[in-house]
């Protein structure tokens, strides 16, 4: 099986990929992973450090052949505002919830989340269901480990470090149980904080 230990950015001159691999956004943050190519072959990606790949980036096989990374279609919401100012306000609300977002001149694209859709519609946004590649802004996405739906895959691709970040975002949607609320869950701590092992009868 061929190994991949290096890569090239999208648009590298004189690059001619001979194979492709389609990946959703939450599987494009990689370090070591077995990849199934579109032609049925498999390669082992084995990089020194985790890399957040974008559509069109190239993996370099040991034999010199190039593999193009393609962003797979995903179930998304397309968000449009009344005007540019309104769209900026909507982007602020999404950013305040640490959601991965693809921000364009006249629209914002996010993963489908019906709670968020209701919020956006309440703010006057037009929200449509679409299926297309998702390429969230790299800044916040890279530093925070992505949207709530990321932790299931990203953690396995680049070690336990993902857990230092991923679990602080998903829980903004009404089921938080992060460190800020640790004393609300007595069973997770010393029993002196709550029910004294159930022996208190008075």
From Swiss-Prot:
GO terms for cellular component: cytoplasm. One of its GO terms (biological process) is urea metabolic process. InterPro entries: UreE (IPR012406), UreE_C_dom (IPR007864), UreE_N (IPR004029), UreE_N_sf (IPR036118). It is found in: Cytoplasm. One of its GO terms (molecular function) is nickel cation binding. Residues 147-193 have a biased composition (Basic and acidic residues). It comes from the Bacteria. Keywords: Chaperone, Cytoplasm, Nickel. Gene3D superfamilies: Urease metallochaperone UreE, N-terminal domain, UreE, C-terminal domain. Involved in urease metallocenter assembly. Binds nickel. Probably functions as a nickel donor during metallocenter assembly. Belongs to the UreE family. This is Urease accessory protein UreE.
């Amino acid at each position: 099986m061929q190994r991949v230990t290096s890569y090239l950015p999208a648009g590298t001159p004189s690059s001619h990929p001979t194979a492709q691999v389609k990946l959703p956004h939450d599987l494009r943050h990689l370090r070591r992973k077995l990849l199934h190519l579109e032609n049925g072959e498999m390669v082992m990606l084995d990089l020194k450090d985790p890399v957040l790949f974008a559509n069109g980036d190239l993996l370099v096989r040991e034999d010199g052949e190039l593999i193009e990374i393609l962003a797979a279609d995903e179930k998304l919401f397309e968000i449009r505002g009344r005007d540019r100012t309104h769209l900026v306000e909507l982007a602020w609300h999404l950013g305040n919830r640490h959601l991965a977002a693809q921000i364009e001149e006249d629209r914002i694209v996010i993963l489908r989340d019906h709670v968020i859709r209701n919020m956006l519609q309440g703010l006057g946004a037009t929200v449509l269901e679409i299926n297309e590649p998702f390429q969230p802004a790299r800044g916040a996405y890279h530093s925070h480990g992505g949207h709530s739906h990321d932790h299931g895959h990203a953690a396995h691709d680049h070690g336990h470090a993902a857990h230092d970040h991923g679990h602080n975002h998903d829980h903004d949607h009404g089921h938080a149980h992060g460190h800020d609320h640790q004393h609300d869950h007595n069973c997770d701590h010393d029993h002196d904080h709550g029910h004294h092992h159930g022996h208190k009868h008075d």
